[in-house]
Swiss-Prot record:
GO terms for biological process: translation. The keyword Ribonucleoprotein applies. Keywords: Ribonucleoprotein, Ribosomal protein. It comes from the Bacteria. The keyword Ribosomal protein applies. This is Small ribosomal subunit protein uS9. Coiled coil: none annotated. It comes from Halalkalibacterium halodurans (strain ATCC BAA-125 / DSM 18197 / FERM 7344 / JCM 9153 / C-125) (Bacillus halodurans). GO terms for molecular function: RNA binding; structural constituent of ribosome. Belongs to the universal ribosomal protein uS9 family. GO terms for cellular component: cytosolic small ribosomal subunit.
């Protein structure tokens, strides 16, 4: 008998997370490592768990994640986005609560490119009057 699985893809900055939800006891595995092992900061762990807490499904599903690209914050945001999308497949009734919390919206903010003549995206070289 095939096990029921729910999929969701999340993105944030340059990170892409492929999330798989499987009925279980709440284990979160990211790239073969546990949540505590993968993310050192407590805030990042909370970000990842937010959609599960919002829908009251914490401890009901095992979360398997394959995340690629970006830094830790971007990856945590991408995982949150992916889990929220996967939860929609579990039960479409979760949509209003996830939507109002903002977990279904792809955060479109990206790093602004560096411009020539400037030191960074907007930082200009020091100006000397004399």
């Amino acid at each position: 008998m095939a096990q029921v699985q729910y999929y969701g893809t999340g993105r944030r900055k340059h990170s892409v997370a492929r999330v798989r939800l499987v009925p279980g006891d709440g284990n979160i595995v990211i790239n073969g490592r546990s949540l505590d092992e993968y993310f050192g900061l407590e805030t990042l762990k909370l970000i990842v768990k937010q959609p599960l807490v919002e829908t009251g499904t914490e401890g009901q599903y095992d979360v398997r994640v394959n995340v690629d690209g970006g830094g830790f914050t971007g990856q945590a945001g991408a995982i949150r986005h992916g889990i929220a999308r996967a939860l929609l497949q579990v039960d479409p009734e979760y949509r209003p609560s996830l939507k109002s919390a903002g977990f279904l919206t792809r955060d479109a903010r990206m790093k602004e490119r560096k411009k020539y003549g400037l030191k960074a995206a907007r930082r200009a070289p020091q100006f000397s009057k004399r």
